[in-house]
Amino acid sequence: MSTIRSIHAREILDSRGNPTLEAEVILEDGSFGRAAVPSGASTGTKEAVELRDGDKTRYLGKGVRKAVDNVNTTIAAALKGFEATDQAGLDRRLIDLDGTENKGRLGANALLGVSMAAAHAAAASNKQALWQYLAARTGVTPSLPVPMMNIINGGAHADNNVDFQEFMVLPVGFTSFSEALRAGTEIFHSLKSVLKGHGLSTAVGDEGGFAPDFRSNVEALDTILEAIGKAGYTAGEDVLLGLDVASSEFFENGKYNLVGENKRLTSEQFVDFLADWAAQYPIITIEDGLAENDWAGWKLLTDRIGKKVQLVGDDLFVTNPKIFQEGIDSGTANAILIKVNQIGTLSETLEAIAMADRAGYAAVVSHRSGETEDTTIADIAVATTATQIKTGSLCRSDRVAKYNQLLRIEEALGAGARYAGRDAFVSLKR
């Protein structure tokens, strides 16, 4: 039987040394599922609430004992005997138990841990890998996503003077995920050599990318291009570039305050700034180019470069189907970033991806800066219409774990494995 026998949660540590919640679900047939919840550094104001204890004498107030207790008491009792394969029903039960719009009573971290662990247990009960189990339910032919590899960290993810949060390489000119991963890895090591040659730091940030001090944001792009060439690849053909601007982090009093450029720009000026970069460099994707509340600026950017550049809403949409629908209706952005903990259940995550597909928007499944060894997002990326995955750089085990899971999935798919490559940017084909 695939009904739930027991649910248990515990407090563990994430990749930044902060507590997070891990949940385990055991079914009556003995099947077992485990999942750990990620946590973000730069967060949208409309994200589901991550419940923290606030006790400054313990883990600097970041403990999650309250969320753990909510799982081990309220949620465990309510879901005992529930059919684990009814993911939508299980998640509705969790949402109803919480009873708030933002999941702030029990905590989105409590709900998500149980939601994902239940899916793992249900897959085990069906004797399937999670990606197989999810694909059977989404009706999607599994495929390997293009990795958006964050090889230079800035902003809230690093202690340096770079304003933009992520500078990424996307290895699109390859026929398999494993070859794309190899190219990204070789570029990463080439970048380390280039940075050393320029006398720059090779210390890494939260997501495993290098975090040197540059004289300007554009110097980061130029350095990456040098590394791509040194690794033997061609920018614009083998490899494209991506940015996570995370502009909400430096949007102050109606202006974009670029410390690295010594500039304070209006929305119109910042759109010009980004459009100029997109014209000069092989940039295929820009995430959070404008601040989450600057919808007028977002619309300007979309109208300006949205036919040639993938414009990803992260803080803008926070994986929330209701907010995302506003973007679809207004023609704002052309892609959505999918973060499981922004919305708080697996079903709502899958619905956001399906919404994107119906609207002709691309979906990018993403990690958070505070990660664990959990690889659920890799399975989600393969089993849905998401065509890209963001899971950091090519070092730190919390990031590499997802890449390794994708390698396992590619091997399991065998001759049927398909890598998205240049076809990943579905919103640019409309």
Swiss-Prot record:
CDD domains: enolase. InterPro entries: Enolase (IPR000941), Enolase-like_C_sf (IPR036849), Enolase-like_N (IPR029017), Enolase_C (IPR020810), Enolase_CS (IPR020809), Enolase_N (IPR020811). The active site is at E207, K339. Signal peptide: none annotated. The keyword Ligase does not apply. Its EC number is 4.2.1.11. Binds a second Mg(2+) ion via substrate during catalysis. Pathway: Carbohydrate degradation; glycolysis; pyruvate from D-glyceraldehyde 3-phosphate: step 4/5. Belongs to the enolase family. Component of the RNA degradosome, a multiprotein complex involved in RNA processing and mRNA degradation. This is Enolase. It comes from Stenotrophomonas maltophilia (strain K279a).
